[in-house]
Amino acid sequence: CGAFPFLAGQTTTIVNMGIIYTSSPIFIILISAIFFGEKFNLIKFFGLITCLIGVLVIIIRGDISFLIGLKFTIGDLWMLGAAIGWALYSIYLYYWKSQLPVFPRFTLIAFFGALSLLPFYLIEEVNFQNTEFNTYFFLWVSFAALSPGIIAFSLYTLAQKHLGASTTGFTLYLFTVYGAFYGIIFFEEQLEFYHYVGTILVFLGIYLVKKKNNYVAKS
């Protein structure tokens, strides 16, 4: 699921990518319920709907006409594949337990993930685009490896140990909230009313999902 968003971004829009990726927690819930018997109650369902609405409010900037004008491309299929891939990865982390601690386990996953992508990298390097190995390149690679890589994946794995696959999946809806506020902080975008509405709805949905008396463990 790591390479798919980059492929999707070549032919589809950020709005489409954001909307489609919000389906990932839904796939986590469906797969967990169908194949692993994890129960899903009514309040968790309302939490899911509330999160979805909150994310959509931010993505479409509070303007419903954004949805009417959407056009879909092959990139949307790549993004759908990324959403399903993340769902499968999340379920794998939770249901296939490992004797290894979090960091050694992540190291092995990252190693074999990089190994599986190596042939595709070589094909791209030879036939399409040569990588320029300079200071700028190594700075961005280091940032990608440390922040969204080691830190984010490790914390996500730790959260799953305590909350389960489907409940932890709801934290993905925070990405849209964080992304909006990063745009305000780093790119001088304006804070609008829809940011407040969407953020409140997302946090309300996550609160409903994570209430201890609403979480039903795998039967």
Which residues fall in each region the model found?
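Membrane-interface helix termini and inter-helical loops of multi-pass transporters
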Residues: Q10, I59-F72, L122-Y136, W140, ...
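Specific transmembrane alpha-helical segments of multi-pass solute transporters/efflux pumps
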Residues: C1-Y21, V57, A145-L163
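Hydrophobic/small/kink-forming positions within alpha-helical transmembrane segments
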Residues: A3, I26-L30, I84-A87, L118, ...
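Hydrophobic transmembrane alpha-helices of multi-pass small-molecule transport proteins
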Residues: I43-G62, L117, Y173, Y182, ...
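Hydrophobic alpha-helical transmembrane segments of multi-pass integral membrane proteins
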Residues: F45-V57, I74-G81, Y89-S147, L174, ...
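A helix-boundary/kink motif common to multi-pass secondary transporters
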Residues: T13, F36-N41, P101-V102, G164-A165, ...
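C-terminal transmembrane-helix exit sites in multi-pass transporters
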Residues: P5, S24-I49, L174-V197
